[in-house]
Structures are given as structure tokens and as C-alpha cells.
Regions:
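Small-residue-rich helix-interface/hinge motifs
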Residues: 3-93, 405-427
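Juxtamembrane extramembrane loops of integral membrane proteins
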Residues: 83-90, 102-105, 148-213, 238, ...
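Internal alpha-helical transmembrane segments
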Residues: 10, 76, 80-153, 438-444, ...
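PDZ/PDZ-like domain segments forming the peptide/carboxylate-binding groove
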Residues: 132-176, 217-255, 259-263
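PDZ/PDZ-like peptide-tail recognition elements
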Residues: 114-147, 183-187, 191-235, 294-296, ...
Length: 466
């Protein structure tokens, strides 16, 4: 429960900050061009019965804007006079146009008002990434330094890769770091026509088609490629199956129930198989039988193997901390001065945007549609503990995501309004208000259906039905 609350708090804080500044971008340009902003709210003030849904609000003197906070923590909004938006204030649109209204302003001013939020989100992301570079620097594990090489799945081996190949680079350039979170490593392989590896001390080239589908690389388990990390115990937690069986730090797990184990990927895969078996067991006796396993362990400093019988926890945990890349390799640490951090942050932010846009095309496939997530999926991106580096890095990523999603040409989104404004600027013909209202309804319907679909995916994943 504590983990859930920590993630929820991070999610609400990040989304609220991003939406607040996004809407602030709209308001900035609106007020700059003399457009009246009627309301600017953090969280939505959805009314319930006679209650208007406002936690508090105020209206400064000599200001036409009501500022406040609603109760529904899903972002916020600003209501601009004379604009057809999700409020569907058609009564206002029936009245005589006023000089302070959005609809009476030149198309170029309305365009800047509409893209103001996206601009703020993108600039904010670059600024956050720059400050992250300044405060924490950039720490990563260089792929070519991983002397034990990679562990490949069957699909990768069919293309010519072999376990323990050290990945050097592709025809597009050398590999930088391994990170299956943003997919840059896999994207480079998917787009490559040649991958260079170091095999048994000799350079070897593998020919690839150059247009591989990246989605299976990161969705399939085991992954297409991942660093070879031996199944060595980093540390043992107290009063756990491992501690009771005599397993200690430095021990190597060699097999589980007769199945060979070389890496933690192997171990996790086998416990995953047990999890599938456990899911269909109905009795306590049957579940105990599944949890009862036989491990072959090579204790630290010992030549012989030791066979251990133990009972895994109900969630099939051994009770150890696994060795990681940091157990075997020294990360590259790049530090930046205040002024050096800006070009580094901008470069990183641009790469994140380029990768996100590149991955977007996969959503058109069946597997890609299944990967769409709602509030639960976004919240799970945050760590189950409070870490400022992770929080700001994820906030910057969400800011880029919010900017890109909002600029999509869907009515009700900023991008939809931009399309209509560009049409007006090119043809000198303004779409009718009746058409704009209908388009807004269509856009809202699309967004609601997408939100239902995304959150339904979250529920199905939570129920292990996907």
C-alpha cells in the first residue's frame, strides 16, 4: 500500500505540474494578445449536486481571470473567452463577438495561443533534463565495456548472434548504452543493416535487414538481447528461504528444479513458469508443491555444487538481491558545469522525443495496441520509493509525451485546433462554428474511448489477463 501511495503522489505531482504549466502556456499567449481568460484551475472543478466542485478560488482586482483549485486531480484547464473547447459553451458563441474574445483575433495569434502549451512542455522538458545533467550528471554503462557480452533469445540467435557476443556498434555508429526503458539500443539494432560484435576476441559482422520490428525485441521474454549477468547473489535478506537454506552473498545459482541457470534472466524465467503453474492450482497443498524447489548452488570459493531443497515465498521469491551491472562493470560518469548542462540536456531531450515519435508507429499493430497504458501504467513508471533523480527524469519524459500527444491532429486536442487554423490561414476561409462544435464532440468521443481502452488494458494486465 505504501508503494502505491508513493507512486500515486509522484504521478499526481508530476501531472499537475505539467498540466499547470501547459495551460499556463495557453494563458500567457492569450493575455499577451488581449484575449480574456475566464478561468484557470489546477485540478478539475467537476460539480456534484449543488456543489460546484471548487476547493477554493479567487479573482484578483483588475483581472478577468478566476484562479482556483478543483477536487479531481487529473490535471487542470484554462477557459478562454470565445473559444470552442471541451466546455461547449455554445451560449457565449451565439452572442455578438467581442474584441477580447479568441474568435476575433487574427489566425496567427490564435495559432500561437493554441501551441503555447506544447511549447512550454517541450521547453520545460529540455530545461529539466539540463538541470538533471547539471545536478547528477550522466551515468551509464557503455555497451562495448561489457566484457561478458550479451545473452540473446532464440530470434536473435537465428539472425547470427551468439551468447557472450560483445556489442560494438552498427553501420549507424557505435552503441552508447544499454537501456531497454527508452529502447535506443534496440532501435539502433532494428534500423541496422550491419551489427559489429567482438566474438572470442575477434571482430565479427552480422548482416541484418535494416527494417526490423522493434516491438517484439522489447516485449518478448526473454528479451532480444540483454547484458550477461551471472545468477550470483549480491546479498541475502533476513528470515527468507535463501537465508534458511544457507545461501550467502557471492553464491552462484546453477539450476532450479533441474533446469540450467546461467543468468538472472534464466532464474526469473523459471520462476515465471512456476507462477503460471501456481495460478491454476486450487488447493493449498498443490501451491506448496509448486513452491517447493530444488536449487543447485555453487557457494563462493567452493569447487563442488551443493543441492538445496527450499520453499519459496507465496509470491515465489527466494529472498535475495540479485547482482546487477554495477556488480561487474564501472559506469561511465559524465559531469557538466551549469552552462555545459544545457547543450547536453537539449541533446538528450531531443533524442528522447525522436525515440518516442519513432516508437509511436508501433501502436498501429495489435501488439502495440496492447502496450497502450492508462493512469496505472504511467504511474508505474515512477519508482516505488522517492528519488528526486528518477522523479525529475520521469517528469521530463512525461512533459515530452504530453507535448507530442497534444499536438496530434485530433479535434479537442491542441493539434486539432492547429490543423483548422492552418486550413484557415491557407484558404482564407474560417470553418463554421457549427462545424467546430461537431468536430469538438468527435474529438472528445475519440479521447474518451482511447482513455477507456488504455485504462482497460491496465486492468487486464493487473488481472494477468494480458
Amino acid at each position: 500500500m505504501e508503494t502505491f501511495l508513493i507512486r500515486l503522489l509522484q504521478f499526481i505531482l508530476a501531472i499537475s505540474l505539467l498540466v499547470l504549466l501547459h495551460e499556463g502556456g495557453h494563458m500567457f499567449f492569450a493575455k499577451l494578445f488581449g484575449v480574456r481568460v475566464e478561468k484557470f484551475f489546477v485540478f478539475f472543478d467537476v460539480g456534484i449536486g449543488k456543489w460546484k466542485g471548487k476547493l477554493f478560488s479567487w479573482k484578483p482586482k483588475k483581472d478577468d481571470t478566476e484562479y482556483g483549485m478543483g477536487w479531481l486531480p487529473l490535471g487542470g484547464y484554462c477557459k478562454i473567452s470565445g473559444m470552442i473547447d471541451e466546455s461547449f459553451d455554445t451560449d457565449q458563441m451565439k452572442q455578438e463577438p467581442q474584441p477580447w474574445e479568441f474568435r476575433t483575433k487574427p489566425a496567427w495569434q490564435r495559432l500561437l495561443i493554441m501551441i503555447g502549451g506544447v511549447l512550454v512542455n517541450f521547453v520545460l522538458a529540455l530545461f529539466i533534463y539540463s538541470m538533471v545533467m547539471f545536478v547528477w550528471g550522466d551515468s551509464y554503462f557503455k555497451v562495448s565495456d561489457m566484457s561478458m557480452g550479451m545473452r540473446f533469445n532464440a530470434e536473435a540467435k537465428a539472425l547470427g548472434f551468439k551468447d557472450h557476443d560483445v556489442m560494438l556498434g552498427t553501420d549507424q555508429g557505435p552503441f552508447r548504452e544499454y537501456a531497454n526503458v527508452n529502447g535506443d539500443f534496440f532501435r539502433q539494432i532494428a534500423q541496422a543493416k550491419r551489427v559489429d560484435v567482438l566474438r572470442n576476441g575477434k571482430k565479427h559482422s552480422i548482416t541484418l535487414p535494416g527494417d526490423m520490428d522493434m516491438l517484439p525485441m522489447i516485449k518478448t521474454r526473454p528479451l532480444f538481447a540483454e547484458p550477461f549477468i551471472p545468477a550470483q547473489v549480491d546479498s541475502v535478506l533476513g528470515d527468507t528461504p535463501a537465508a534458511k537454506a544457507g545461501i550467502k552473498a557471492g553464491d552462484l545459482i546453477k539450476s532450479i528444479n533441474g533446469k540450467p541457470v546461467e543468468t538472472w534472466t534464466d532464474m526469473n524465467y523459471q520462476t515465471g513458469v512456476l507462477s503460471d503453474v501456481l495460478a491454476v492450482k486450487n488447493t493449498h497443498k498443490d501451491s506448496l508443491a509448486v513452491r517447493s524447489v530444488v536449487l543447485t548452488v555453487q557457494h563462493k570459493g567452493a569447487a563442488k555444487l551443493d543441492t538445496l531443497k527450499l520453499m519459496l515465498t507465496p509470491d515465489l521469491k527466494l529472498g535475495v538481491l540479485q547482482s546487477t551491472l554495477a556488480s561487474y562493470y564501472k559506469p561511465v560518469q559524465e559531469e557538466y558545469s551549469f552552462f555545459e548542462s544545457f547543450p547536453a540536456g537539449i541533446k538528450h531531450g531531443w533524442n528522447v522525443l525522436r525515440g518516442y515519435v519513432g516508437n509511436f508507429r508501433y501502436l498501429a499493430s495489435a501488439d502495440g495496441a496492447k502496450s497502450i497504458g492508462g493512469f496505472g501504467a504511467i504511474g508505474s513508471l515512477f519508482p516505488p520509493f522517492w528519488d528526486w533523480y528518477m522523479f525529475w527524469s520521469m517528469t521530463a519524459f512525461l512533459s515530452i509525451m504530453l507535448a507530442f500527444m497534444n499536438i496530434l491532429p485530433i479535434p479537442a486536442l491542441d493539434g486539432g485546433h492547429v490543423v483548422f487554423l492552418l486550413y484557415e490561414m491557407i484558404t482564407r476561409r474560417k470553418p463554421s462554428e457549427k462545424f467546430m462544435v461537431r468536430a469538438e464532440y468527435v474529438g472528445i468521443t475519440i479521447l474518451i474511448l482511447l482513455m477507456i481502452f488504455a485504462n482497460l488494458n491496465d486492468i487486464l494486465r493487473w488481472l494477468h489477463l494480458m
